[in-house]
Amino acid sequence: MENLNALSGNQNLEVWQLRLYVAGQTPKSVTAFINLKKICEEYLNGQYQIEIIDLTQQPELAIEDSILALPTLVRKLPEPIKKIIGDLSNTEKVLVGLQILPSMDWKI
């Protein structure tokens, strides 16, 4: 398990706790991490913590968040818990799925 912290000195802002479940360092897992890191850097202003959980090393941890597919991103905080499956390459879907940006489903 690897912890990657990017916390700024300003602790007044809410820290996003994100957990990325992967199965080793496959191309899809690496892509998911790169995409997640890019999104966090751009939209969360350094107020995030990413925890990488490799289920090939710790398969029992999949039970805690009911992980059925990989890679899976779990937003632990802020609540409610949210999950996104895949390589996180569609930035807009990730932003909406994590509720960083509101859904733009409506048409004018």
Curated annotation (Swiss-Prot):
Could you tell me which InterPro entries the record lists for this protein? Answer: KaiB-like, KaiB_domain, Thioredoxin-like_sf
Q: Which biological process, per GO, is one annotated for this protein? A: rhythmic process
Q: Which SUPFAM superfamilies match?
A: Thioredoxin-like (SSF52833)
Report the SMART domains cross-referenced here: KaiB (SM01248)
Q: Which residues cross the membrane?
A: none
Free-text disruption phenotype from the record: A kaiB2-kaiC2 deletion mutant cannot be made.
Looking at the Swiss-Prot or TrEMBL record, what is one Pfam family this protein matches?
KaiB
Write out the similarity annotation: Belongs to the KaiB family.
State the function annotated in the UniProt record. An paralog of KaiB1, the major clock oscillator protein in this species. A metamorphic protein which may reversibly switch between an inactive tetrameric fold and a rare thioredoxin-like monomeric fold (KaiB(fs)).
Q: What is this protein called?
A: Circadian clock protein KaiB2
Source organism per entry reads Synechocystis sp. (strain ATCC 27184 / PCC 6803 / Kazusa)
Which gene produces this protein? Answer: kaiB2
